[in-house]
Amino acid sequence: MNVTDLKKVFKVKTLSKDEILFKEGETDGEGYKIETGTISLIKNNIRAEILGPGEVLGVWKVFFKNKGRFFTAVAEEKTNLIILPEKYLEEKVSKADPFIKHCFRSWLDLTRKFMMGSQ
């Protein structure tokens, strides 16, 4: 599916400023694509990143089979997101070429180790 078609198929969620999308450690597996607005990713009460339109968040659980969320995600302003269901993400990952999955997971694992080591 083309990225531009996502909002034709999936639900859109609107967050108000300072509304929490998800908390670190939560176990739901939905992903999100930001349509408008910005989301802060917070780890240990430190803002690690601010994401904006076109960026995707909340998908690490599916890619790594993690049990919980790595960050808390908070809207910096009114924000519209497309909800990417966990089953949809799992289906996409399961159909990916095994070599590409290996490369992607290796890169993400290295990134995650770096982030955890830099705290």
Please report, for each region that a protein language model flagged, where it lies by residue.
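Residue-level detector of alpha-helix boundaries and kinks
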Residues: 2-3, 22, 92
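Short, surface-exposed beta-strand-loop junctions and turns on beta-sheet-rich folds
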Residues: 40, 47-49, 88-91, 98
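Short proline/glycine- and basic residue-enriched helix-capping loop/turn segments at helix->loop/beta transitions
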Residues: 1-17, 81
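Exposed alpha-helical structural elements
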Residues: 1-5, 88, 99
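A small-molecule sensor/coupling module
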Residues: 69, 89-119
